[in-house]
Amino acid sequence: MNDAAPDRQASVDFHLQALHPWLSRQDIAEICVNRPGQLWYEDRNGWNRQESGALTLDHLHALATATARFCDRDICPERPLLAASLPGGERVQIVVPPACEPGTLSLTIRKPARRIWPLSELLRDTLDLPGVPGASQARPDPLLDPWRRGAWDDFLRLAVQAGKAILVAGQTGSGKTTLMNALSGEIPPRERIVTIEDVRELRLDPATNHVHLLYGTPTEGRTAAVSATELLRAALRMAPTRILLAELRGGEAFDFLQACASGHSGGISTCHAASADMALQRLTLMCMQHPNCQMLPYSTLRALVESVIDIVVVVERRAGQGARRRVVDIWYRDGLPAP
């Protein structure tokens, strides 16, 4: 064993003392620090917020550095993402600027299960399941009533609250981000949100449990070339209820679809397109840029897109009407064409 290993572990343990009240609780599964002084933890009742003066920015950076050294890794502006394991077996994801907002640091700790649960206990609270194949009945869709009535504000509000995957489409300056911010405001406050964008435009309630991640390229003058795909992968280790990706531009579209299809429903994103069908087509073509999709036929990827994206909202800025921005089309996979 490396002679420095015990010292490195001791350093991590020392800096983890500020989190001991939550790490020691058996009923807590996730611990998240979104910004200095603010901690969120998830127990059987959901997410809870706790203020902690010990979690200063300097302390968080010291913990990040100690964790990186313990794992023989680096965390710095050039390498702002760290996925590692703590001495106690907990998994940790750390994000530092420029991949998150200046003056912040994101820390997510997932505690391992301390016992092996017998199958009988795991299934104790299972919903009643049909004993005969094919006997299950589809649940009523609460979105169909406002959809049929053309009550679009109610429809979109319920869609967000129901965790539908929504794509906002439109041309430059059409109001895509404005609508995405309005939709984000309907996300239930109990959820944990991770946003991914190149420039901070998404606005969330400061009181909610959220983290803003930022990507860039060397040509934009950023110190770190962190891609949207890298941040999507990091976000999946940050206990998100849902992921908001400000704009889809390339192969990261496939990673976004994978995230939405793997238990992180309710994703919202935007793309440049003039109609719902063009948006679905563009999203399919973006997926084809992903290394894992380049040999897949268009029809296969189009089917994937339409199986994951529930709703496409098209916005438009019309000249000659006071440059008014408005919704001009809504596509709903489970509904009839919009009237």
UniProtKB/Swiss-Prot annotation:
It catalyses: ATP + H2O + cellular proteinSide 1 = ADP + phosphate + cellular proteinSide 2. GO terms for molecular function: ATP binding; ATP hydrolysis activity; protein-exporting ATPase activity. CDD domains: VirB11-like_ATPase. It is found in: Cell inner membrane. InterPro entries: P-loop_NTPase (IPR027417), Sigma_54_int_dom_ATP-bd_1 (IPR025662), T2SS/T4SS_dom (IPR001482), T4SS_GSP_E_ATPase (IPR050921), VirB11 (IPR014155). SUPFAM superfamilies: P-loop containing nucleoside triphosphate hydrolases. Keywords: ATP-binding, Cell inner membrane, Cell membrane, Membrane, Nucleotide-binding, Protein transport, Translocase, Transport, Virulence. It is a peripheral membrane protein. Pfam families: T2SSE. ATPase component of the type IV secretion system Ptl required for secretion of assembled pertussis toxin (PTX) through the outer membrane. Acts as a molecular motor to provide the energy that is required for the export of proteins. Belongs to the GSP E family. This is Type IV secretion system protein PtlH. It comes from Bordetella pertussis (strain Tohama I / ATCC BAA-589 / NCTC 13251).
